[in-house]
Amino acid sequence: MRVAPPALLVTALALGACGPRAPASPVIPELTLVDTAGGTTTVPDDLARAKVTVVVFYAEHCPCFSVHEARLRELVRAYADRGVRVILVDSEVSATRERDARAAAERGLPAIALDPGGKLADALGADYATFTVVFDEQGRVRYRGGIDSDKARLNDDAAAYVRNAVDDLLAGREPRTPEGKALGCALQKR
């Protein structure tokens, strides 16, 4: 009987771990977030209400977020009739419904849900504006990180992390990039 050398076994195990993997789904506390239009989002239940749910953390003062507003508006428009729900969440200590409602209306953004105390942000590991989490229809985290690879400029060659994850999930595939770097302003949660 021939025994495989230890180096071969280690290599085989390491290769089995290669490739994209979906991020671990965090334990999300039961919360009801009220948005600027008077609607509510109950987590974690509502995260599995659509084919794909995209949660984007928002900060009114963040120039990185402002730069990405056009891409967010396009994301909402392009996927609205395909079962994709986009939820903007403001976890900042200074967040008010009135200020966020005004900002959403002026900037053409969807209603913004308030996350007092940053409980949802903490549960999802969101420390920066533009941090995005994409959930599948079972409410599992399938992507987490930045909207794309841009920080403060909209480059045509930016890696479209969120759009690619949404397209992959709608096509029944694993997201090709399950994690990306979040580039934005630090959330002032407390």
Question: For each of these PLM feature ranges, what is it?
Answer:
Residues 1-8:
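Bacterial N-terminal signal peptides that target proteins for export
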Residues 19-21:
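Bacterial signal peptide processing site
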Residues 59-70, 93, 183-188:
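Short, thiol/selenol-centered motifs that function as redox-active sites or metal-ligating centers
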Residues 66-107, 113-123:
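Structural microenvironment flanking redox-active thiols in thiol-disulfide oxidoreductases
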Residues 116-190:
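Thiol/selenol-based redox catalytic cores and closely related redox-interacting motifs
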